[in-house]
Amino acid sequence: MNKFYLMIAYEVTKASDGENPEMKKLIREVAKNNPEIMERCEVFTADRGYDDTEIITDLWDEHKVKAVIDIRNCWQDKDEIRMFENRQNIIGYDNFGTIYCYCPESGKRREMSFSGFEKDRESLKYTCPCKAYGVQCEGCKTCPYANKSVRIKMEEDPRRFTAIARSSHKWNREYDIRTSVERVNSRIDNAYGFEKHYIRGKKKMKLRVGLSLLIMLVMALGRIKEKQPERMRSLVARVS
């Protein structure tokens, strides 16, 4: 699915089939059959049902596509903070990849400021809150990271440390776009009559779904040819 709410690839499966294996197959098929699409693609968004390290790493390593996928809370303590090794017990992170620092004097925890993604280093850069926000910290004189930045390599934990930081506003904006899939599913159910259907058998269902998506794409193409791109998703507006 793209930002225009139009289908790029699809598959009809049994309800018992796993989503992640099917998604991996679809990504490989698009990369093989339509490499120009993967070359233009910058961000891949999906809900936590597709939270999978292999999907995230393959998208970045093979195609340099940034995955924006919600993460499941797999830690027993949802408020747990894990400390990085070789960071002098000062820098830590939570299950969602948010980076924190601890004052070496008071032990107070503060969220560090995300300062950007360094593609060449495949690292996320975070800045000391004293420098970023001007906060007062008792341990500034003794903290080795005071008024400095730290880099977190993606490879340390690809699920949590993604190219678009999970704690950033950009991540939230991109994640909201995933609703395009839900809107297309809603259109298939309502406009194309799949919510109440009497189709039996996977082959028949695949044919009907394929025809519906084809109609959707053809109508969008017609709108574009008629210089009405703003109506490419409309099913009822007249082509003048």
Regions found by a protein language model. Give the residues of each.
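Polybasic low-complexity intrinsically disordered regions
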Residues: M1-K64, V68-W75
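Detector for glycine-centered tight turns/loop "hinges" at secondary-structure junctions
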Residues: Y5, N95-T98, G107, L124, ...
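Alpha-helix N-cap/loop-to-helix boundary motif
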Residues: A15, A132, R173-D176
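Generic recognition of cysteine residues
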Residues: C41, C74, C101-C103, C128-C130, ...
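Short amphipathic alpha-helical "interface-anchor" segments enriched in bulky aromatics
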Residues: I81-E118, M154-R200
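Long, low-complexity, polar/charged, intrinsically disordered or flexibly structured peripheral segments
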Residues: K119-A163
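Basic, amphipathic alpha-helical segments enriched in Lys/Arg and hydrophobic/aromatic residues
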Residues: H169-S240
